[in-house]
Amino acid sequence: DRMAPIRAMQVFGDAGGKLEFTAFDTGVSELGWILESSLMACEFWESAKRQGNLTLFCPARPSRLEFRHDAAILELADGTTLSARLLVGADGRDSWVRQAAGLAAVNSPYGEKGLVANFATAKPHRNIAYQWFRDDGVLAYLPLPGNRISIVWSTPDVAADELCALPPEQLCERVAEAGGHVLGRLELLTPAVAF
């Protein structure tokens, strides 16, 4: 009950534009899947543990990085030393690897945030993902199991903060109205967060 297929999409643009497509039309059983990020992270972890050609060092913290002409040498806090011809820094926005390698980064504010929340819907979504390109941003309704959806509303920073501050009933009405009440009345299931 933590993942659901997308069997169709309806995309709405400005000036009344609309695009619809289905998994059936494209010859596949589903266009994609919506699942909780924690479920995907857990599956990635379990898959990594099953790989015969992968050694996991967990938990571990890096303490020192050195580059030689033929290798990158990474020392862990417990004293373990690792050597490789290629070092990939996939450790997030505030990357320790990037900083230790002396690589500069420029952070540019987007000027908008993604508001995320889950709702119960009065009408069934029938595994349809909806997306609206609006003057105030892009809103997506993503199907979850049962009569539930997850929404992502990419909107300017100030608008996202205002939406997060609304009482649940008002947020439900704003999100339902922005989506043309396509799924009827909404009930907030999780707190709205913006990032």
Segments predicted by a language model, with ranges:
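Short acidic-hydrophobic surface loop/beta-edge motif
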Residues: 11, 74, 129-134, 142
